[in-house]
Amino acid sequence: LMALATDLNEFTHFVAKPARGHGNVTGADNVVSWQTGYPFGVNFSKGYPRFNPGEFTTVDTLSRKEADAAVIIASDPVANFPKPAIEHITSDKCKLISIDTKQTPTSEAAHVSIQTSTYGINTGGTVYRMDDVPISLRPAFDSPFPSDLEVLTKLRKKVRELKNGNRCQSVSR
């Protein structure tokens, strides 16, 4: 495939890119790159971004059993990751939260699964095509489910409350 792309570049601009999974994967990569200068495998544990593929990627962290919790957004690692990562993310030693628009093997394995609206259909925003071109989308119709942003905002608020000692019983929609 790479040889074909090279040959075709003699006549036109041609690139070979892997097909991406569901969700706005290209958008996530673009935002991480824009905010940190690194495309993936970014670690913020020291308070600043550090890049080290082979050490800081999700697969690496899960395979080494270093994560005690995982929040998976619009992705299906249980269907796609290597066996050691899947075994850890589905174990009792790693609390799994799935935030997704549909049911997946990951949402089925999760300790907590939250269904969200579909961006570009129920929620507006910017998505990136697989060739890195941003597209602004408006919602076509309403959804009974909250957006990813609404869920993550409430989750962040709750974590901050718990961190500050304000224990509450539940998070309402």
Language-model segments: what does each one mean?
Residues 1-173:
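Non-catalytic alpha/beta scaffold blocks inside enzyme catalytic domains
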